[in-house]
């Protein structure tokens, strides 16, 4: 029997997108063939490529992020190009990543009479708040309301967002979070110490990791100012964005601010495991904050590291429930300093780290995500899938493993 083909639609070039990669590899592990139509707006990647078994076909259409309402014209042309390629492709399920691929995937699925999966990585209309005309945002909400009532499966990243879609009429919705493979965050003490020493962090120093987009809403300046008065605290800061100049200047002034530039996937785990604390900053006033369940949360849980975060979204709920970090009342320099001072206490930090690791191993890890995908795709493709082998839970000393 030929393997069932899942056609994924994506509006980035897949370099690779971490969430899309995890889901694609899981489906391949279940015996599916995964084909991916991706938009390369920078015209830099290969037109056809196979990465880890994922068959990628890129659609070239030059554009830029952040165009606002004028991006609609580029989407119209993109849809025509993708529709032509998609209809020439044999597939058994169409899997639409985010709202900007859903209308196209919905049309393809209906024309070919195949199941349609909507994978909502976030609340897309909320993400666009302030960057497109209000009428466009309202239209997107109405469009999404129409489509979520008619797709076969809605997957999203957290329970709060899943309930939000359910209240708006989604027929069948499940959570597959941005959960991490525990094995990818497994490090020995020696490996972690090697990373720390390579960065010039003393064994006795308190290392905070913050790998993110360097944007104004990520509360980076508050962290940088907070550590100035804490001589034992070091910050491993990675990413690209509009604040790169500010971060570079801060690192030049303060040798305890270690700017490592853009960080590829594997190195995120290296730095997270080598650190003592994970910092996540985001503007609570952003409409998407109420649903926030970011990668940083699951990276910290997989590595067994306490978190410092703001009081919003699913991330705050998890940190409180698991007792695995500190939820800031507000993002102010003084509040960040208080949190760091608390976590300088080895006993408190070790207890929170153990809680993070336990919660990650038992509740929010990629083994659980693969199980959900298998269950849901088995109902879409009866009798066609192999059960995933999964990951065995790792010993506490092995996951993340350095000083706490």
What kind of region is each of these model predictions?
Residues 47-49, 135-138, 186-201, 390:
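A short helix/loop element that forms part of the nucleotide-sugar donor recognition site in Leloir-type
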Residues 80-88, 103, 107-111, 124, ...:
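Membrane-proximal helix-turn-helix segments that form the acceptor-binding/catalytic region
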Residues 160, 179:
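Carbohydrate-associated surface elements
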Residues 245-270:
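Nucleotide-activated donor-binding/catalytic signature segment of Leloir-type glycosyltransferases, i.e.
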Residues 277-280, 299-309:
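Short hydrophobic beta-strand element within catalytic cores of glycosyltransferases
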Residues 321-322, 326-333, 341-347:
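Conserved acidic donor-binding segment of nucleotide-sugar-dependent glycosyltransferases
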